[in-house]
Amino acid sequence: MASEIHMTGPMCLIENTNGRLMANPEALKILSAITQPMVVVAIVGLYRTGKSYLMNKLAGKKKGFSLGSTVQSHTKGIWMWCVPHPKKPGHILVLLDTEGLGDVEKGDNQNDSWIFALAVLLSSTFVYNSIGTINQQAMDQLYYVTELTHRIRSKSSPDENENEVEDSADFVSFFPDFVWTLRDFSLDLEADGQPLTPDEYLTYSLKLKKGTSQKDETFNLPRLCIRKFFPKKKCFVFDRPVHRRKLAQLEKLQDEELDPEFVQQVADFCSYIFSNSKTKTLSGGIQVNGPRLESLVLTYVNAISSGDLPCMENAVLALAQIENSAAVQKAIAHYEQQMGQKVQLPTETLQELLDLHRDSEREAIEVFIRSSFKDVDHLFQKELAAQLEKKRDDFCKQNQEASSDRCSALLQVIFSPLEEEVKAGIYSKPGGYRLFVQKLQDLKKKYYEEPRKGIQAEEILQTYLKSKESMTDAILQTDQTLTEKEKEIEVERVKAESAQASAKMLQEMQRKNEQMMEQKERSYQEHLKQLTEKMENDRVQLLKEQERTLALKLQEQEQLLKEGFQKESRIMKNEIQDLQTKMRRRKACTIS
């Protein structure tokens, strides 16, 4: 059942205390209760640039994230506000407001770089907010983007000869969409006398300079990083909302008191975010919900705190460990529920129980397959198989015990009157043995006619009859109407009957063993069938993701070539060839 969101305001998600980042347990608890998929929008920018105002607008509130009206930075760490998505039913909009970059009070660029990296890692849409035009100063202030190769790893164990830049070639596959918001923008949008849209202005501003000097490289590096890491880009410009003196009361002012152009620009920005920001997903198309976002936050923050680099692959594997373990328990619970509803012990035959087990097992595997992902070496599915086998054996044992109890109770009811008659000496007389045998046959017939005795019916009966052999023999020996020869013949008949019953029981035992072996093979085949289907689906999903990444890289390479940057185009071409090689291997991969 969908969880309800009752966040009346933002809460600190990642605290920044004395330069140390820590996840806030209260915020994590809120995330852990949200089961719906999440669209995560993070905003980053220099302090005192009005980031919080835009986030409050996205939340549909006038107040929430602290605006602050002095040169002092208000937001510390990363703050979170979860609200129902206004355009996507069944989705949650998660707004992440970050502390201002370049706060003079901190004097620690390291800290800013981690905040920037975390915002990128956690979001599906990354908003960079700045004042004025995109000039070199604005680009210099965005040097954090050039730090990402030193702050994030995509793979946990990159090849030994693979450097940070090569590892960063995978960033595009999981990085968010990029939105640049330009505040207090007062210039006309044009280049070479031609009017530009905000998006064209951004593309124009990201053009590279030809040249190999240090100055040229400094100019090009942030632009190259933005183009390479964030292929999907959008730009919005905002006029100054009010006169500078009224900015301090911005959250108290009505829209009618603001510049109409600004009001429309904010509305356009919000509309774009609501309609175009995608659901946060992980490799394999896994949609992020509250518990998954909670796990990502913990994994990344713990990595930073311990001096490691946040790693996308490690974060996904840590999440998979948690979810796959839960998937095993969910599958077992489903199996137990189904067996509890369907099975009535004792079953008439072992096969009846095994058929019910097979149906419930198939459903349990389906539950696991739906709920699991990244099950490296299929360890969790093997664990599920072992637990299901144990559950099956437990049911077989319970079935056996239920049958034994039922049959023992029946024997007591059916045969106790005969035992009482024997004790009373009714059969200790001439011709008594034949009467006894006839009565015994009648009672055995009555026993066989009783329903739902289960799989122990014959064994329990034969054990009972064997325990009464001395009583039967005593009646035989005292019957004076029988000759010694007739007694010998009768003894042999009883022995033969007993031997025949034993042989029948042995046959039955062998048949049960064969049925159990057949069931084990069927279980193995069912696991293999569903696993094969899942692996094929995962392969197709990964190929789709790689094809999307390939298209974006080809587009960027073509643009670099068009602009005349041969060296950068060659680097991109190498990345493309590496990706195409991986895709060819993936396409050729067959599951045997």
UniProtKB/Swiss-Prot annotation:
Q: Which residues form the propeptide?
A: 590-592
Cysteine methyl ester modification sites are C589
Q: What induces it?
A: By IFNG during macrophage activation, and by TNF and IL1B.
Q: What is the effect of changing K207R?
A: In 8KR mutant; abolished ubiquitination by S. flexneri IpaH9.8
The record's subcellular location field reads:
Cytoplasmic vesicle membrane; Golgi apparatus membrane; Cell membrane; Cytoplasm, Cytosol
Instruction: Please give the chief subcellular localization of this protein.
Output: membrane
Modified how? Isoprenylation is required for proper subcellular location. Phosphorylated at Ser-156 by PIM1 in absence of infection, inhibits GBP1: phosphorylation promotes interaction with 14-3-3 protein sigma (SFN), leading to GBP1 retention in the cytosol. Dephosphorylated in response to infection, liberating GBP1.
User: Consequence of mutating K210R?
Assistant: In 8KR mutant; abolished ubiquitination by S. flexneri IpaH9.8
The chain residues annotated with the modification Phosphoserine are S156
Alphabetical list of InterPro entries matching this protein: G_GB1_RHD3_dom, GBP_C, Guanylate-bd/ATL_C, Guanylate-bd_C_sf, Guanylate-bd_N, P-loop_NTPase
How this chain assembles, per its entry, is: Homodimer; homodimerization occurs upon GTP-binding and is required for the second hydrolysis step from GDP to GMP. Undergoes conformational changes and oligomerization upon GTP-binding and hydrolysis. Heterodimer with other family members, including GBP2, GBP3, GBP4 and GBP5. Dimerization regulates subcellular location to membranous structures. Interacts with SQSTM1. Interacts (when phosphorylated) with 14-3-3 protein sigma (SFN); leading to GBP1 retention in the cytosol and inactivation.
Q: What is this protein called?
A: Guanylate-binding protein 1
From what organism does this protein derive?
Homo sapiens (Human)
Q: Which gene encodes it?
A: GBP1
